[in-house]
């Protein structure tokens, strides 16, 4: 079984064929898909998707790319929503949250304030975090050290080995996906090959970050089987071993997956 720890399955790119996309994921061997929210207006959507589909889990949060549009009461609404769903069997934690120092025109002070409040919230309720760390790993790590949420995932990580080790030491797993499939992504591929096996999880970030064989087309969770095969080749492991270790890692850092049973075992295909 494979777990896609980061997929925006609620995105409009899937509106015309979402059911088929989910079916294809199951046929490819996926037993769980984690769908993080990005702003207040899709909180209902990701929760409803998780409640409708037996292999979908959800997270709630405010993504750094959308904080300029966040309302003054969004953080309080997030707190109230988290209090309401913290015992929901499909709720994995707070995400997607973090900092983005790459996209121009964002209010960095606003990003920082919103991120800090969400990390504090995760720590208060003992919830994992799903992190956006683009060009911002050190600043994100600083807040993790300060508030100490119990676990989480650094999604689409592309920092240094030292930065990765700091995150791992704080209970985070490191997410690898489509970017790893490009030969030119040397840093990401080195990280995937060399970081501790217990730190690795898989993701698609679909419909974004398409793997090499799909780029520039739409990504989808079914591609995770071939992404897992790339990781297996980089580490000199079998596909089955990679599936087993990344699934165990995902369930460790997102305990709701383990507590509610992240899908039934399935054959892993690469078609």
Could you describe each region identified by the protein language model?
Residues 1-271:
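Mid-domain alpha/beta scaffold segments of enzyme catalytic cores
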């Amino acid at each position: 079984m494979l777990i896609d720890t980061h997929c925006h399955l609620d995105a409009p790119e899937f509106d015309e064929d979402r059911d088929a996309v989910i079916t294809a994921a199951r046929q490819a061997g996926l037993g769980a898909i984690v769908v993080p929210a990005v702003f207040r207006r899709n909180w209902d959507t990701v929760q409803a998707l998780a409640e409708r589909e037996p292999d979908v889990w959800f997270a709630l949060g405010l993504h750094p790319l959308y904080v300029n549009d966040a309302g003054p009461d969004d953080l309080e609404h997030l707190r109230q929503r988290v209090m309401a769903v913290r015992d929901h069997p499909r709720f994995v934690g707070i995400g997607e949250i973090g900092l983005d120092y790459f996209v121009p025109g964002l209010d960095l002070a606003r990003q920082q304030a919103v991120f800090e409040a969400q990390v504090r919230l995760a720590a208060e309720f003992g919830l994992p975090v799903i992190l956006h760390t683009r060009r911002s790993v050190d600043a994100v790590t600083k807040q993790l050290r300060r508030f100490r949420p119990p676990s989480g995932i650094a999604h689409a990580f592309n920092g240094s080995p030292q930065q990765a080790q700091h995150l791992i030491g704080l209970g985070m797993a490191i997410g690898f996906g489509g970017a790893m499939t490009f030969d030119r992504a040397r840093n990401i591929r080195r990280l995937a090959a060399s970081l501790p096996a217990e730190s690795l999880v898989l993701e698609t970030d679909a419909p974004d970050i398409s793997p090499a064989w799909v780029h520039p087309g739409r990504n989808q969770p079914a591609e995770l089987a071939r992404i897992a095969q790339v990781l297996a080749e980089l580490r000199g492991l079998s596909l089955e071993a990679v599936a087993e270790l990344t699934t165990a890692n995902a369930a460790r850092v997102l305990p709701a997956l383990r507590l509610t049973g992240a899908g039934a075992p399935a054959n892993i295909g690469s078609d």
